[in-house]
C-alpha cells in the first residue's frame, strides 16, 4: 500500500499519490524492492539482473535513503536506463499527472553523480511524448529546448494515441479536463501532430521543413 490509510480504507477517491504534488501520507521506501534485488543478485549462477525501465524517478527523489539509487547504478543498469519525463512543459506535465521537469533534472543529476562515483559510463534514455492533450507548438518548442540542453538526440518519439479509460483520452475527445472542467487544447490534425514530433527531433535533416513551418506558425 502507498500509505497506512490505503491499507485500511483503500485508495482515495479523486486523488493521486504523487500528483499534483506528493501526498503527505505517502510512505516512501524502496526497502522491499531493494531486498528483492539483493536476493536475486545472491542467487547461484545469476551474473546480472538488469532494469531497463519502469522506475518512477519522482518517487525515487522523495526517498531520503540513497541506497536504492546507488545499488541501481552499481548493479542493475546495462549501459542505459530508460525513464519517462515525457515532456518538459510544466503545464503539459500537469495534465499528464507528472511532476515538474525540475524533478527529472534533479534525478538526472543524481544519476550522473552516482554513475561517476561508481566509475561507470551509463546514460539515461528519455521517453518523450508529442501531441498530448494540453501540448501546443510552443510547448513542443520548450520540449525541443530541453532536448538540446540535456544533450539528447531522441531517435523515437511517442505520438499521443488515445486509449480507452484514461483521463488523457477523455481530454482528447471532449476538449475538457475532467478534473477541472476547463477547456483544454488537443492537437488532432496529422499536420500539427507531425510538426510537434518534428520539433522534438529537430536534429533530423528530414524534419527541417516541418520545423521551419512550426516556428513560422508560432
Name each region found by the language model.
Residues 3-31, 94-96, 100-102, 148, ...:
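Radical SAM enzyme [4Fe-4S]-AdoMet core and its adjacent flexible, acidic
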Residues 69-78, 145-158:
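Structural recognition of alpha->loop->beta junctions
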